Amino acid sequence: GTLSWKRTRTALTVGVENIKNYAYFATDKIAYNDEGGQFAGYSNRISVKQYGGSVQVFSARLNQNFKFGILHWDNEVAYQKTSNQDILPLPDLSAYSNLYIVFRIAKVLRVQLGGDVRYFTEYYAPDYAPIIQQFTVQSPETRMKLGNYPICNAYVNLFLKHCRFYVNVNHVNNGTGNKNAFLVPHYPINPMNIHFGLSWNFFN
């Protein structure tokens, strides 16, 4: 259920789910040897599995937005707890914060200038299997934890009637902290990059 307070720009959502006979993809590591009989590595095998019991997931999400004149600060914090991290892994805590200012130039050009950050605590994030284009539970033998790394971006949006010009600087904190810049195992986040462009809405 959700409780919302418009006056304070606050919303709280709490939920509990009970999932029975949960089906999922899993990655199994199969060891293989070289011609001399020595261990050479692992090969991946993707399989479909089903958990015969029940998995419970508790979640609570708090949205809190602030506005002080031209300054805006939008926030979301989510807490999740799964009863079985081995088959349904979830980060305990995830957060998003967006701080920006909005003002006008010459009364016609609306400017939005700010930055945002995303963060989640460490967990065994699902692996990606390109051969089936699906996410899978990591193999217990070689699984790795991801998270505890903020992803920071900066941006500017310029609005003129139906036209928007934007500049995004993504992953501005590249190379800092624990450098664990992954959302999916073995697939690093792109280093700092700049995107810019123009969009037009064709309506009156």
Where are these regions (language model features)?
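Exposed, low-structure sequence patches enriched in small/polar residues
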Residues: 1-204
